[in-house]
């Protein structure tokens, strides 16, 4: 289990991400990169594009 904040958890092997509105969500990747839109994320070693819909290396 990964502890995000204030009792919010995500499954092991995932990453906690927080949306701009303060809502936590679980990125399905270990050490994932959270996108600014608060809904998407990328694998470790990749980053989100400006639209937060594509992952770039």
UniProtKB/Swiss-Prot annotation:
PTM field: Granulins are disulfide bridged.
UniProt entry keywords in alphabetical sequence: Cytokine, Disulfide bond, Secreted
Protein name in UniProt: Granulin-3
Location, primary (coarse class): secreted
Pfam families registered for this protein in UniProt: Granulin
Cellular compartments annotated: Secreted
Record-linked SMART domains: GRAN (SM00277)
Domain of life: Eukaryota
